[in-house]
């Protein structure tokens, strides 16, 4: 996907707010499954549309659910092409939810 978007690894992990070491772990350790929130960071960093996100999540063992508040909020951002992770985190916090962090993955 990075090649399709003419994006370097460094550009991607910075845009997605993913630590370089964590990104390397995702890339090189095939048995490692990143957290759901990290996958959402990846979706926002890749600027996926809603269908692409729905197709991408199962590749990493997740699915989009309208029963999960975080999914609804991230889905809103994706649907409306708002790829600002900081703004998404602010909205999540305002709703009493955890921001999309990945440092402890």
Model segments located where?
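The DNA-recognition helices of helix-turn-helix-type DNA-binding domains
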Residues: 19, 30, 60-63
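The alpha-helix within a helix-turn-helix
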Residues: 2, 13, 43
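A short, Lys/Arg-rich alpha-helix, primarily the initiator
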Residues: 1-8, 86-105
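Short alpha-helical DNA-recognition segment
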Residues: 6-25
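Short, charged recognition helix plus adjacent turn
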Residues: 54-82, 103
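Short, basic-rich loop-to-helix N-cap that marks the start of a DNA-contacting helix
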Residues: 30-44
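Residues in the recognition helix of alpha-helical DNA-binding motifs
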Residues: 1, 15, 26, 56
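Helix N-cap / loop-to-helix initiation motif
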Residues: 8, 19, 35, 47-52, ...
